[in-house]
Amino acid sequence: MSEGNQPKRVLGLPDVDPSQQDTFETPDPPESISNLADESSELVNESIDRSSLKPAKSHLKFANRKFNNDNEDFSDSIYKKSVPRTGGLLKNQTVFDILPSDESKVETPLQKFQRLQYEVMSFREEMQVIADNGGEVEKDIKGVDLTHQLADLQNQLSHLLENEKLQPILDENKQVIHYSQIQNNSSKKLISEIESFTQQSLSSSTTEQNTQQPSNNNTTTNITSSSSITPNHVTYELFYTGEQSKSQQLQRIQDLEKRLAKLETATGNKTTDSVPITQSILEIKEKLSLLDTTKIDVLQQKMKTVSKEMESLKIQDETSTKALTTNEKKINDIFETMNKWDIVGQQVPAIINRLYTLRSLHEEGISFSNHVSNLEKQQNDITSLLISNSSLMNKMDDSFKSNLLTIKSNIQQLESRIETLQNRQQQQQQ
């Protein structure tokens, strides 16, 4: 379409500038809309961790780690292997009554205490492995320091059991006694209620017999008993607490642990920290695994390399003996030269005394030269100050002259204005 026909086509439409070219708006492609929708959905999702990862730091973190797949079964069988127990009492998580992460359920003090013991124990063992390998958890944070801090935490948890008020709540052994005391009190209360019930039943039977006796006269009497009607049953509620049975199981397991610790000390375990038997068995298995044929071949290759190095050391010893003979000759030559220097050494004290006498002269000359240099510096400073002062005086003279001229001009202007004002006043008065 030609440009001449264009204004006629849009002449009657509102809000249209006919002087500009036609422009057509097209919708964006659907891909950008979908991308925006995806981005908005990803931004709303709070479970995604958007922290940037640094490859160097992650490499340092997993550099000394090894993958252990001993307990994994890659066969096609459905049968699940029974996982052996590793560690002591605190490692078996099923022993403790640890609640799931649910807001409706609240942990008891005993459950919280046991959970903290378990978490601190497991975390300390992880840090002990890192400390044995000599690694670092993070930058400038060693595993040994963390193990010491975790040991302090365990001591603080153990000190809680020493408090007499907290022992019935936190100690499993004391808790069994606490529950037994509660049961004894409840049983005594039940017996007292049964006795009171029997007494009430007897009293009610006697009152009924008295009311049923016939009267000798023909007159009828209405007898009303003022005693209150008592119920003929006793309600006794029994509450079963699962913590008692669990505490008894824990007490049995603790007794077994103590017996095992005594056996370990009797067999010659001299370490202060009690190491569980499963851990020692795993260490023995690791030592026995060194007797494999593949590892023995590796050891043979290492022995061959060591023998080659020993032979190279023998060759180096022979070369070192030759070097020692040459060194002995050099030492003899040095000894002869030192004997010659002994004669010169006898004259050294006289030379030293002469140097001491010359030292005072040199020091006086140095001090005099320093004074002269200071005087020269002061003279230069004074000359520079005089030059700067003269330049400033010249500038002051120039500025005074310019200021006088401006003042004179201002005075003349003021006088002229005053004269004009006086003339105007005279004219107005006339």
UniProtKB/Swiss-Prot annotation:
Which residues does UniProt assign to the signal peptide? none
The answer to whether keyword Ubl conjugation applies is no
**Keywords annotated in UniProt:** Coiled coil, Cytoplasm, Cytoskeleton, Dynein, Membrane, Microtubule
Biased composition (Polar residues) is annotated at: 32-44
Q: What processes in GO biological process is this protein linked to?
A: mitotic cell cycle; mitotic spindle organization
Query: Would I find Coiled coil among this entry's keywords?
Result: yes
Which parts form a coiled-coil structure per UniProt?
A: 241-319, 397-430
Topological category with respect to the lipid bilayer:
Peripheral membrane protein
Gene Ontology CC annotation, any one: dynactin complex
Q: How does it assemble?
A: Subunit of dynactin, a multiprotein complex associated with dynein.
Q: Which family does it belong to?
A: Belongs to the dynactin subunit 2 family.
Q: Which PANTHER family match?
A: DYNACTIN SUBUNIT
Official protein name in the record: Dynactin subunit 2
Q: Which gene encodes it?
A: dynB
